[in-house]
Each structure stands twice: as C-alpha cells, then as structure tokens.
A protein has these predicted regions:
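Adenine nucleotide-associated cytosolic modules
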Residues: 1-249
C-alpha cells in the first residue's frame, strides 16, 4: 500500500490509467540489477531510482575519468578517481532517498547470484559480460534489458528466453565466434553523449512497461536500432536459433 509520501513522489505516474497505484506498488517491490555504471548505467540508475524501483544493485569496478564526463551524467568533475558504482549510488539517493540501493565494486562474472532479482539491466560495453548476463538471465528466468551505444548509434533489446521458450536469447542473435570481435566500446570507437542517454532512458521505459503496466504486449523478440544521424528507429523481428547452446534446450 502506498503511503502519502509515495503518492506525492510518484503522483505523475500513478495517474496514468494503465499504471495507477498497483503499478507503482509493483515497481516498489521490484529488485533490479544494473551491470555497468557508465554512459548507459547512469541514466538507467537515475531514472530507475526516480521511478521508484524498490531495490537496485549496481556493479562496476571502474573509476571515473575525465573522458567519461561527456556522457556519464551522474559523474562530475570533482568525482574523478572515485568508483563509478559507489558514486552513482550517492547520486541516485539524492533523487530518491526512499529506495534501497547498493554498489558492488567487484567484476561481474558467472559466479554472481542473480536469483533474487526480477530484472537485469545490461549496461556493459564488454562482449563477454553480455554473454554472461544472457546465460544467467536465461538460467534463472529473468528479464534482461540490454542496451549498447557507439558513435551515433544505439541498440536496445529485451530478452526473456528463460520465461518463454519461443523467445530468442542474446546468443541466438550474436553467437560466440573465434573471430576478432568488432570494436564496440566508447573508448576505442567514440560516442556522442546523448545517444547513451537516449538508449538508457529507453531501457528503463521498457522495464517500467514490463513490470508496472497491466495490459502490455512485450517488445521482447525484437531488436531496436537507433541512428542518431537520421533519427531513424528500426525494429527488427528476431528469430530463435534452435541450435543455440544457451536456450535451445
């Protein structure tokens, strides 16, 4: 049951007919994991905190550098040298002190227990981390909302293969290969800051729809491609790989 402070804080959300107080209660009862506290992780964590996701855990072992500041909007000049996850938690609490939110400074790997989370935000720029998140989310039947951004382009997808066997997983579409992977990180390829802000905001928007809305048809099973030069947003229907080593069995 929402208290008076909740009703005031989330007033502009709960008046939406398909959202209402029940939707807000579902958000407040949601445990979410954010992997990455950089260009995507910052807007994801800030908007998830503002929306009232009740418990948030953020993983990132990296420290803040001056070259991060064009896009990692929670981090400021006087935060340089601080751990990204720790700093992001403090900035989120300034927006919403009523949620529970903690940071983890260790590297995210396959030993991390994700069983208590309801959904996972993939905000990493490391290919191996994305495969690990995909495997864990499938195994433990979690919603995985994955974003990526480089230069002036972004991608977004919702993966629910563990919840519905008809959906593809990340590895169905991006299979592991022995070939050298293309450069997908901002450090080497470059990034325009607002692109990460847009994709991160879309990740939270999808999470809110998955958790809070009553009558909602999931966008899982699609890949969304954003082009910052043309403002095009393309939607590609994805097919399950029935030979996929992660989700085919």
């Amino acid at each position: 049951m929402l208290n008076d402070d909740d009703l005031n804080r989330y007033a502009r959300q709960v008046i939406i007919p398909d959202f209402d107080e029940e939707g807000q209660e579902r958000l407040l009862n949601t445990n979410c994991l954010i992997v990455g506290a950089g260009g995507l992780g910052c807007p994801v964590a800030l908007y998830a905190s503002a929306a009232g996701f009740g418990y948030i855990e953020i993983y990132d072992q990296d420290i803040i550098k001056i070259s991060n500041l064009n896009r990692q909007i929670a981090h400021k000049n006087d935060h340089i040298g601080n751990n990204k996850a720790e700093n992001l938690v403090q900035e989120c609490l300034k927006i919403n002190p009523n949620i529970s939110i903690i940071s983890r400074k260790n590297i995210f790997d396959e030993t991390i227990d994700v069983s208590n989370f309801d959904l996972i935000f993939d905000c990493s720029d490391n290919p191996e981390t994305k495969y690990i998140l995909n495997s864990l989310s499938h195994k433990f039947k979690k919603i995985l909302i994955s974003g990526s951004a480089v230069q002036m382009e972004g991608q977004l997808a919702i993966w629910k293969s563990g919840l519905n066997k008809d959906y593809p997983c990340y590895e169905c579409i991006f299979p592991r290969t022995n070939e050298k992977a293309p450069i997908t990180n901002c450090r080497d390829a470059g990034i325009i800051g607002p692109v990460t802000g847009l994709i991160g905001s879309m990740q939270v928007n999808e999470a809110i729809k998955e958790i809070a809305l009553k009558d909602y048809q999931s966008t899982a099973g699609n890949l969304f491609l954003y082009d910052g030069l043309t403002l095009n947003l393309d939607k590609i229907k994805l097919k399950k790989n029935h030979q996929c080593p992660v989700c085919s069995n």
